[in-house]
């Protein structure tokens, strides 16, 4: 996390949910002229409410750069070209960045449809809301050198691991591969915890041992910090969203998954809410 960018650009965060809102708050705290937009009512955003713009046209006209942190491709389409349509207006940003996890194929399609005068980059992030609030996200970025250079001061405020991986689509390709491994970790840890309970082993002791052994995973190591770590599967929650991430990975392979990927999705959908007492530092 570093100081504000030197340029005068006005930044918009579209989709001020569990990731987008703390990202916007980090930028504001660093002195960035940042505004938010969301389909929810402005008064739901607490101290950030004065920086929220409810009307999509007003939001598009105010912002030079828009970072999209909406849930999925359907919401991205609506934001860009649908009812909200910030990119089909005369007053619109000159740089649009998708930070949502989409498929690389969807990113290529979005890039091809950018209006004249609108640059594009993909910059999905990893780290969960607690790291978004700390400004320590990891960004995986795809785009032209000049475009990414313009964005880099913003990423350095919101993150401490910024990786420019190549042209448009490279960031998303890395993200879906990373998330595929992450989902494997979620399912494996939850299965191990269920087995430990069935076998009479203290689950906290198991987590402690795995954290310093070959069973270490991002999910297991951060289970008390991750806000969704105890969720059961529901299409509307974060566990449901990571099902979409596996499907984005499969889409990148032209649907070429096999038995393992099918079993992973099946196991993910069976996850029940986790009843685990908080750890000593949580």
Where are these regions (language model features)?
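Rossmann-fold NAD(P) dinucleotide-binding segment
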Residues: 56-120
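Short, well-ordered alpha-helix to beta-strand connector turns
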Residues: 31, 49, 63, 93, ...
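Beta-strand segments within the central parallel beta-sheet cores of soluble alpha/beta enzyme folds
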Residues: 204-212, 263-267
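Active-site-proximal catalytic alpha-helix in oxidoreductases
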Residues: 135-142, 163, 167-199, 211-221, ...
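NAD(P)+-binding Rossmann beta1-loop-alpha1 motif at the extreme N-terminus of oxidoreductases
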Residues: 1-69, 129, 198
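Rossmann-fold dinucleotide-binding core
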Residues: 100-179
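Interdomain hinge/lid region at the active-site interface
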Residues: 218-278
């Amino acid at each position: 996390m570093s100081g504000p960018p030197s340029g005068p650009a006005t930044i918009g965060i579209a989709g001020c949910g569990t990731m987008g809102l703390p990202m916007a708050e980090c930028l504001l705290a660093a002195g960035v002229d940042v505004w938010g937009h969301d389909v929810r009512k402005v008064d739901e955003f607490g101290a950030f409410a004065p920086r929220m713009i409810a009307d999509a046209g007003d939001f598009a006209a105010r912002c030079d750069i828009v970072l999209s942190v909406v849930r999925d491709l359907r919401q991205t389409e609506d934001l860009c070209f649908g009812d909200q349509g910030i990119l089909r207006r005369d007053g619109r940003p000159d740089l649009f960045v998708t930070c949502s996890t989409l498929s690389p194929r969807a990113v290529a399609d979005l890039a091809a449809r950018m209006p004249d005068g609108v640059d594009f980059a993909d910059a999905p992030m990893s780290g969960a809301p607690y790291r978004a609030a700390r400004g320590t996200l990891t960004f995986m970025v795809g785009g032209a050198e000049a475009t990414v250079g313009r964005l880099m001061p913003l990423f350095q405020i919101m993150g401490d691991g910024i990786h420019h991986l190549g042209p448009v689509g490279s960031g998303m390709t890395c993200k879906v591969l990373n998330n595929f491994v992450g989902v494997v970790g979620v399912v494996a840890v939850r299965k191990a915890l269920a087995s430990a309970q069935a076998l009479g082993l203290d689950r906290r002791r198991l987590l402690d041992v795995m954290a310093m052994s070959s069973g270490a995973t991002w999910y297991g190591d951060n289970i008390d910090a991750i806000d969704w770590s105890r969720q059961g599967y529901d299409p509307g929650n974060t566990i449901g969203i990571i099902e979409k991430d596996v499907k984005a990975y499969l889409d990148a392979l032209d649907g070429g998954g096999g038995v393992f990927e099918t079993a992973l999705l099946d196991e993910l959908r069976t996850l029940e809410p986790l009843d685990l007492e908080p750890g000593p530092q949580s």
